[in-house]
Regions:
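Oxidoreductase cofactor-interface core, primarily capturing Rossmann-like NAD(P)-dependent enzymes
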Residues: 2-46, 50-59, 128-250, 261-265
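Short beta-strand elements of ligand-binding domains
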Residues: 119-125
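Structural motif
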Residues: 11, 91-92, 120
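NAD(P)H-binding glycine-rich loop region in Rossmannoid oxidoreductase-like domains
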Residues: 50-116, 131-133
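Short, amphipathic alpha-helical "lid/cap" segments that border enzyme active or binding sites
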Residues: 84, 205-213, 302-310
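A hydrophobic C-terminal alpha-helical subdomain
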Residues: 257-314
């Protein structure tokens, strides 16, 4: 088995233990090519979280260690030089959580990975297609992600992969996102961002993780480019139909046009969520045909929206 493994699988560091990071750890451990004798898997944990964890984090840490995952003390808000030293022992770094990081953190992290000579890097780029959205999309909120891509494309020492998965399925159903809201009287409200004809791609975290593991462990997997995956690709109109059917509820439909969302964002320019909604209402770089994705061509069966609702939202 070990002869099939690319060199990048020898020592893997995962950054982030939230929904995606935890799923990636499980995805790596459960991959058919994973061999504990040939690959070590580590998780970066803040020193304070390691020494004084909350009850929830303490339980999580015990579970991770029981699975053979090494817990490594380190803070991604440390200096670039400190991060470079931290990353040097690893052949792969997989970053799985960066929405709340201060500006400049993603670039610093990428520079540290490159300076450390890490063989393989999956940056925090999970989501939409930043190349298509461009630097101006969402009032420039994704310009740092584009800078990260420019940095990676300008070098050839570290192989990299960007996983374009659309919006996380769980995020699509979060109350704060505002797209799906259960109402009294066996009703559910679905709000389209811009119009009912706008299209979105969505993938659940567990499937993003499965695809990540598949990319890491297979020597013939694509590198140095974005890889597109999809659990579902559908219009908001189709999405509303699916929600109503899966929940067996009457759907109350409303749309927030792009102009309205831009006005709301301009009133509160520091609110990232409102800027995200503008990006989704602008309609660029948000979707791709499911049948044309790498995951479909690889024969990976990913969970669609209807099945996700029946398992997680009923």
């Amino acid at each position: 088995m070990t002869s099939q493994l690319p060199a990048r699988t020898k020592s893997i560091l995962v950054i982030g233990s939230g929904e995606l990071g935890s799923a990636i750890l499980q995805g790596l451990l459960s991959h058919p090519l994973y061999d504990a004798r040939a690959s070590s898997i580590s998780l970066l944990v803040r020193p304070t979280t390691l020494s004084s964890p909350s009850p929830e984090k303490a339980k999580q840490q015990v579970e991770f260690q029981a699975l053979g995952i090494k817990l490594v003390a380190g803070d991604i808000e440390a200096s670039q030089d400190e991060l470079t030293a931290l990353f040097q022992p690893y052949t792969s770094v997989l970053h799985a959580g960066g929405m709340a990081l201060p500006a400049g953190s993603l670039l610093k992290l990428t520079r540290a990975v490159l300076a450390a000579g890490v063989q393989y890097y999956a940056p925090w780029q999970h989501g939409v297609d930043y190349d298509v959205i461009g630097r101006q999309g969402g009032q420039g909120m994704f310009s740092e992600q584009i800078d990260v891509r420019d940095l990676l494309r300008a070098q050839s020492s570290t192989a990299w992969v960007v996983i374009s998965c659309g919006i996380f399925t769980s995020f699509l159903f979060e109350d704060f996102w505002g797209v799906v809201k259960k109402l009294p009287g066996n009703k559910v409200q679905v709000t389209a961002l811009n119009s009912w004809e706008d299209i979105i791609t969505t993938t659940r975290a567990d499937d993003i993780a499965r695809c990540t593991a598949e990319l890491v462990f297979n020597a013939d997997a694509p590198v140095n480019e974005p890889v597109y995956i999809a659990g579902d690709t559908l219009t908001y109109g189709q999405f509303a139909d699916v929600v109503g059917r899966a929940l067996n509820r009457e759907v109350i439909r409303q749309a927030w046009p792009l102009g309205y969302l831009r006005e709301e964002s301009q009133k509160d320019p520091e609110d990232k969520l409102k800027r995200y909604r503008v990006v989704f209402a602008e309609g660029r770089g948000l979707s791709w045909p499911k049948e044309e994705t790498w995951s479909a061509q690889r024969g990976l069966k990913l969970m669609g929206v209807e099945e996700w609702i029946r398992q997680h939202f009923v």
